[in-house]
Amino acid sequence: MLLIDLAGYELTQEEQELLEHPLVSGLILFTRNFHDKAQLQALIKSVRQRVKKPLLITVDQEGGRVQRFREGFTKLPAMQSFLQLDRLQLAQEAGWLMSAEMFALDIDLSFAPVLDLGHCSKAIGDRSFGEDVATMLPVAEAFIDGMREIGMAATGKHFPGHGHVIADSHLETPFDDRPKETIFNHDIQPFKQLIAKGKLSAIMPAHVIYTQCDSQPASGSSYWLKEILRKQLQFNGVIFSDDLGMKGAGFMGNYVERSEKALQAGCDLLLLCNEPDGVVQVLDNLKYQPTPTQKERYLSLMKRKQISWSELTASPRWQQAHQQLATLQDQWLEWKAQNA
């Protein structure tokens, strides 16, 4: 059950054939797929029309430095800004607006929000709402409530917490040597509490090895995904692997081995990006048949609400939220400059 990427602005015949493979469930879009809104809408329409099966179309449109579509879209401030600048009431509107803009493009899912604690990690930084569970959790929950209000599934990442490793898992495999008790009493709490409230439809584990807990990265660890996430926390939603093309996943072997280990560990859907040869290797060599439960889980993430861009941007709610978020973005950039 792979989610793969596209090379450019248009769907090629080869990419169409890959998307039609029975082991491919969807795709993830990047900035390289975006020239302008009209082109992006045409690309998505082409995918929907040419590939004759349900495809989950996804993106990372978190806000801040991780916002794949910018020109013509609302500038979403980094998640840290909502707590740092005491704009908690805007968090729900941000979740709603981000989701609404993606739905208006016929995108099913934005992988959000980040639930990692702390700002020291190179990979996370101001993508995190905050450092303390008690203060960040209401903000994260409000953002999720905004997503859920319009019908977008929330994906909590990066389980059980990526915020306290300096290394960037895009570039290397990070190791977290802190005691097990610290991770369970601190980092895992946002996930635990939001799962208990039924707020998370999906979870994305980290490519981090928690040395005092298990020898494998969480994304390839049955301890983290089956024992802790499924059994202990009673999570019954979708588990996405983080991008198996990242250097942090290299600990698990080649692309086929990474995919096998992630599936065996408990992942339902696998992201494999920026490695077209790796995608072909996996599709040619992976011996895997998704279960009916896994198919049901992934189909549950498909968007249910139809909304046009013109209707959305004409609504008073969007116009007000758009302006408020633009103001917060300016305030956040000013705050960062003053506190650099």
UniProtKB/Swiss-Prot annotation:
Q: Which pathway features in its UniProt record?
A: Cell wall biogenesis; peptidoglycan recycling
At what residues does the UniProt record annotate the site feature described as Important for catalytic activity? Answer: 168
**Active-site feature positions:** 170 (proton donor/acceptor), 242 (nucleophile)
Gene Ontology cellular component annotations, sorted alphabetically = cytoplasm
GO MF annotation terms: beta-N-acetylhexosaminidase activity
Write down the chemical reaction(s) this protein catalyses.
Hydrolysis of terminal non-reducing N-acetyl-D-hexosamine residues in N-acetyl-beta-D-hexosaminides
Going by the entry's taxonomy, the superkingdom of the source organism is recorded as Bacteria
Q: Which family does it belong to?
A: Belongs to the glycosyl hydrolase 3 family. NagZ subfamily.
Protein name per Swiss-Prot or TrEMBL: Beta-hexosaminidase
